[in-house]
């Protein structure tokens, strides 16, 4: 699997389970009588810290029962590390997914080259297509980003739909 150039820089900055647990506890403690809460895994690439993501999801489920809460969880990923095991776990645990794809191939590869400058689009599209095909009705959408390099972003939206992603969002 190809890694983006910045991934080694951020490995030492990954959140520990202790910090994640305290964040969940804070959310529950400060949600008052509110039954429904939300927790989002995003920033950097959450799947680089997969073990902590799993621990946190398991902890949230235990705390939901203990405190009578319903916590909707979502995870934003670039899809590079999204494999069958992760898709199954996230789907089985009802985690909403925001799948990030920076437009069509030439746009995406320009914005997100691999560690050696190679394109990542083909591998990511393959991973996202597998994910979407195996969501079993669980929520997801593919989020594209438009920049000064793809002001014709409608072309990117059409490309995403043509790749089998009917749930698409575009963001600046």
Over which residues does each language-model region extend?
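Single conserved hydrophobic/aromatic residue that forms the stacking wall/gate
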Residues: 1-8
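Short helix/strand-bridging catalytic loops that position acidic/His residues to coordinate divalent metals
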Residues: 11
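Radical SAM/AdoMet-radical enzyme domain recognition
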Residues: 17-20, 24-40, 49-172
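Short acidic donor-binding/metal-coordinating loop in glycosyltransferase active sites
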Residues: 43-44
